[in-house]
């Protein structure tokens, strides 16, 4: 299984590292997209992008590295790709899942759950989990709001593969 990371800041202050294990064995295409966007090896990716939507007791959303507001992003396969499968469930905090605009519209946007989210099962593809830095996830969560607007600018300063 691939291991990737984000080094995250809030308003320029370093928060720390979030490490993820990707489910290459269950959703290889989805995991490979995220891995390659973490390394930036295709010439684009997550480095320098933001968490544009953070809702406490729900999730942290990021991955729009083209428009930085939730309307953009792209996958390594082109703009969008199909839902691979829904084997993994949104059954706990710290899960990595694809954000989308309906069936088969995966790009680069993702979210990290902060609570179990069973209503998302069968609609969003879970492709990894936080293995280290859940405290950083909780810190980012504290900068969110009910509307999703963040009180601080949350930036992925560095990302890559370990």
UniProtKB/Swiss-Prot annotation:
GO CC aspect terms: cytoplasm; fungal biofilm matrix; mitochondrial intermembrane space; Set3 complex; yeast-form cell wall
A GO biological process held by the record: ascospore formation
Protein name: Peptidyl-prolyl cis-trans isomerase
Subcellular location: Cytoplasm
Transmembrane portions of the chain: none
Activity control: Binds cyclosporin A (CsA). CsA mediates some of its effects via an inhibitory action on PPIase.
Purpose of the protein: PPIases accelerate the folding of proteins. It catalyzes the cis-trans isomerization of proline imidic peptide bonds in oligopeptides.
SUPFAM superfamilies: Cyclophilin-like
Domain PPIase cyclophilin-type as annotated: residue spans: 5-161
Catalytic activity annotation: [protein]-peptidylproline (omega=180) = [protein]-peptidylproline (omega=0)
Family that this chain belongs to: Belongs to the cyclophilin-type PPIase family. PPIase A subfamily.
GO molecular function: cyclosporin A binding; peptidyl-prolyl cis-trans isomerase activity
Record key words, sorted: Cytoplasm, Isomerase, Rotamase
Species assigned in the record: Candida albicans (strain SC5314 / ATCC MYA-2876)
InterPro entries the UniProt entry points to: Cyclophilin-like_dom_sf, Cyclophilin-type_PPIase, Cyclophilin-type_PPIase_CS, Cyclophilin-type_PPIase_dom
Top-level division of the source organism's lineage: Eukaryota
